[in-house]
Curated annotation (Swiss-Prot):
GO biological process terms on file: translation
GO cellular component: a single term: cytosolic small ribosomal subunit
Entry's family note: Belongs to the bacterial ribosomal protein bS18 family.
Xref: Gene3D superfamilies: Ribosomal protein S18
Segments of this protein annotated with the region Disordered: 1-25
This protein's UniProt keywords: Ribonucleoprotein, Ribosomal protein, RNA-binding, rRNA-binding
Name the record gives this protein: Small ribosomal subunit protein bS18
InterPro entries: Ribosomal_bS18, Ribosomal_bS18_CS, Ribosomal_bS18_sf
PROSITE patterns: RIBOSOMAL_S18 (PS00057)
Length: 97
């Protein structure tokens, strides 16, 4: 009545791997990003608008921590300094098309 199936064929969820996860051939190990401000012992300043441009997109949005790699402390300070630079007209609020 029932077919005789060995245990390897029965458990198709593991896909032949013992840990139960499929191995992704496209997976790459990424180097953990380090905070530029911690590395250089520097504090974000609104007067250095050329340096602040690296943390702002073309549309004028502040890039998040997960992309820039800044620490939480410096990201908060960076956001304040970008806003100061915008208020002083050193950085644009939005890019004009």
């Amino acid at each position: 009545m029932y077919k005789d199936i060995d245990s390897h064929q029965r458990d198709s969820r593991t896909d032949g791997h013992q840990d139960g996860f499929k191995k992704n051939p496209n997976f790459r190990f990424f180097k953990k990003k380090t905070c530029r401000f911690c590395d250089m012992d520097r504090v974000p300043d609104y007067k250095e608008f050329d340096f602040l441009k690296k943390f702002v997109t073309e549309q004028g949005k502040i890039l998040p921590r997960r992309i820039t790699g800044t620490s939480a402390k410096h990201q908060r300070r960076l956001a304040l300094e970008v806003k100061k630079a915008r208020y002083m007209a050193l950085l644009p609020f939005v890019k004009k098309y």
